[in-house]
Amino acid sequence: MPPKKSNARNASLLKEAVTNAGRSDTASTAREGSIAATFVSDSDSSTTASGPVDEKVAAVAELITTLTTNAASDKRQSAADDIAKFVEAEGVAQMVKTKILHGIATGLHNTKQPVAREGAITAIETLIKSPVSKQIEPYMITFIPVLLERLSDKAKTVCLAADSALKALITRLTPYATKQVLPLLLAGIEYSQKWQTKVGALELMQSLSKTAPRQMTTAVPDLVPPLSEVMHDTKAEAKNAGRQTMEAICELINNKDIEKFIPALIDTIANPEKVPDTVHLLGATTFVSEVLPPTLAIMVPLLSRGLNERQTAIKRKAAVIIINMCKLVEKPQIIAPFLPRLLPTLEKIQDDVADPECRQVCQNATKILTKVGIPAPGTVMDDSYEFKKLDDKALAYLKKAIGHQQITEIPEAYRPVLEYLEHIAAAMVADGNMDNDDWNGSIIPTLKAFIPTEGTVTNAVKEFRELSFGSNVKEAVAEEEEDDAEELCNCEFSLAYGARVLLNRTHLILKRGHRYGLTGANGSGKSTLMRAIANGQVEGFPPADQLKTVAVEHDLDGAHEHDNKEVQAFVLEDPVYAHLPKETVVNMLESVGFKGPMATRPVGQLSGGWRMKLALARAMLHNADILLLDEPTNHLDVINVAWLQDYLIGLKTVTSIIVSHDSSFLDIVCSDIIHLDNFKLKRYRGNLSKFVEAVPEAKAYYELGAAQQTFRFPEPGMLEGVKTKERAILKVQNAVFQYPGTDRRQLNGVTFQCSLGSRVAVVGPNGAGKSTLIKLLCGVIEPDNGVVWRHPNLRIAYVAQHAFEHIEKHTNLTPNQYIQWRYQTGEDREEMEKAARQISAEEEAAMKKVQVISGEKKVVDSVIGRRKLKNSYEYEVSWVGKLSNENSWLPRDTLIEMGFLKKVQEIDQAEAARQGLARPLTQKEIEKHLSDVGIDSEIGTHSHIRGLSGGQKVKVVIAGAMWQRPHLLVLDEPTNFLDRDSLGALKTAIDAYGGGVIMVTHSREFSEAICKEVWKVDNGELTPTGHNWVSGQGSGPRLEDKNKDEEVFDAFGNKIDVAKQKSKLSGKDLRKKRKEREARRKRGEEVSDDDE
């Protein structure tokens, strides 16, 4: 809650009024520092001199006497009218000198004579309604505290008069004077013991909400706390008025996200037991509007109470609302006053609550509150809702104008005018209002009493306005560079995706021929913004008939429907290009490399790089004004990347917006960088290197090691017989593979091996066979010829080039649910779907052959399990028509010769999976695993996969693959979709990972930072360099099992007690044991067989 703003002066004025209500007339007249004395200058001795002034003083004194003593109301009104006419004719200076205000104040404080009080109030109301009301408004404001007290006067007529006068003043009040009046009204609520005074002050606030809505809106943070207290007042009238005023004030809050919940928010203030229901209600809200102090003022009481609820779910949801709202706060000064209500409670929850997820959410809320609400060192806090002292030069000028050159000491009688104009000017400066008409309308009516000449007073206000702004001028929007490029777009918009806000009231300006690099973290909304532009969903963006915008995304939409069509026919038969001459289409296809056989190749046989080229060619046939390129270098080799760079730079009349994590590509191509951060788009002139100079935290674009994120991969388990990281755990010899229906081999006699220490980069041009090689290594495909050997317990994690294929059938699940589905049977369900696991018809027939075992003919029913046999394994086999006690154990080689290779591999994979899945498949364990690859619990457990960004989906795929603690991690184009910070985190995780890593990538920067070994693939042949292949264990350091002390769990989270293996005794120990047994026998002790 912001601190109460009722200053000491306002409180003392009210207390003074209350105290003086019981004094005698003489005492109230003589008191020093009273309200009446305010209007008498210490140097005003000239009023006693003889002459015209004496006559005016006498005439005014007679009117004051009639006003405060005459019992007839019409006589008192007549006297009040004459006083108003006198002030109108003679001006403010004569009003002060003739002590009119002094006389009114004296009558107002006359506690013995109701007629005096009523007459004084009549004069006040008459002056307020007179033509000179604006000139004397500063003085009328000073009567507010006493008039509020007169609302509870014993004389009913005085109460009614005070009520009428206050309403007349408030309805005519200059709007920008609201900031000066509100503390006086708040004092009436907070310090008065009379309910009539409270109700009156509350009703005046309601009036102000109609006459000065803009000014009252900025004051909402000051008003909500005291109004909340009044809503619990013991007096029903005050309580009801407080509720009505709160409703009137909250109607001013301009936030479409919460406006329908405002009645419920007010209800929770009056009825705290409704807090849980309201928190649930707001927890399902998508926040897209900018959050300002008025919104926080009504939300923070609910959130504070929500954090203090007993239910953990309510605490968590309140913290989530805080996170979502903080993302829409632009400046620290907006939220800083509310931090004391939220931060201590959030920090306490982190220490006290048992639920780790709730603690994590509260920790995240604390971080974002601290980041948003506590400014960086050197930042100047600018609270627009506090009264700010004017610039000294402006104040000096104002004193000069009012005091007629008496700059050093202005007459005390004019002090109310000075304070009034200072408040108005400060309020207009805080509002950023430099409009001449507003300044003239607010200040000239009062200032012209001191500068009567119209031209002079107008110039004075102009100079005063300029001096008032002084150093408080708000930061102007940076001007666009001065060039002659045509402006294609200039719009302000917000953007949300599902329940997540991506951009909030941000500007987008695009110019013809510029090439904009769109940067930002994964999940910040880059691809969503591109799609929104392409689909015409950006508010204010020119429509398609005015501006041709074409999107080039990372794959061909609907390409699966046309897999069998030839490339050239695929484009020519598309209705979109029917109006183009065939020659134009053919030339465009040839320009990106589709010549000769490539032009007639089926779309389904194109590699990822060729698919991207086809997408680019199709986009360029549109003759677009704006090209939207989302990761255009994905799947492109170095030659094609260079071609794309040259092509884009050569488009002098076409604007490009590019999302790419290829730093060298952005450096060469971009003329500008548009950075997406904190829900805003900010443009930086120059290429990526210039951007990094301006934003040092973006250093990760150049240095992968500078990443702020960190990933961590689980350590792989031990493999039997593997003592060092150099020993081969996978070997391929002379493997040959050719896709059916193709005219050449994709792999031709390739030989390689992998170990736990492998760090391999697979490189080569598009279509050379890199992805095919990886699929062979992982068992997705089997070779037509050659030998593939994998360690029987080897676990391989594979992230495909089109990583989304792993999760495309599970987009309605959360990442947490996806991992639970994938491993719920104890095995990797994706692994079971691989081609290497599927049994062909020929293999099925071979397995049904009759086998002769120990002279008996038998048919294999199934392979059940395995056990160790010297340096290999033997497998338990059940037979058709035989009981289980007749099962046999056959060596591995025997079963393979019988045609049961895939069944043997199935048992091996199941055993390997069992060893790798020794961890509980529970929500909490999976959340921890997901957090190790940069997916927090809010996304991992509470967001569906379909709502995630491309980079977040890739992280989910990596997490899913790493759950089984693999020995080999295979990444096909890992740099696709991941932002630079995530790539740096991935590099760090790979460096620390205890297993082998094989990756296909065109990113030389990424591969060189990680890989020592390079496999160059070209025309289906493999040329390895930098490898260290050994035939045995090698000479490296011996491995230690880092997971040996970890507890083992089944898939349901139940702990498994693992018996420790007994170490084999040496010969010396065995001989010692025998001697001990013989000695025990000689002593007559029994020695069991177990002891033997």
From Swiss-Prot:
HEAT repeats lie at residues 95-133, 138-175, 177-214, 218-255, 257-293, 294-331, 333-370. SUPFAM superfamilies: ARM repeat, Chromo domain-like, P-loop containing nucleoside triphosphate hydrolases. It comes from the Eukaryota. Keywords: ATP-binding, Cytoplasm, Elongation factor, Hydrolase, Nucleotide-binding, Protein biosynthesis, Repeat, RNA-binding. InterPro entries: AAA+_ATPase (IPR003593), ABC_transporter-like_ATP-bd (IPR003439), ABC_transporter-like_CS (IPR017871), ABCF_EF3_subfamily (IPR050611), ARM-like (IPR011989), ARM-type_fold (IPR016024), Chromo-like_dom_sf (IPR016197), Chromo/chromo_shadow_dom (IPR000953). Ribosome-dependent ATPase that functions in cytoplasmic translation elongation. Required for the ATP-dependent release of deacylated tRNA from the ribosomal E-site during protein biosynthesis. Stimulates the eEF1A-dependent binding of aminoacyl-tRNA to the ribosomal A-site, which has reduced affinity for tRNA as long as the E-site is occupied. Assists translation termination by stimulating the release of nascent protein from the ribosome by release factors. This is Elongation factor 3. The gene is TEF3.
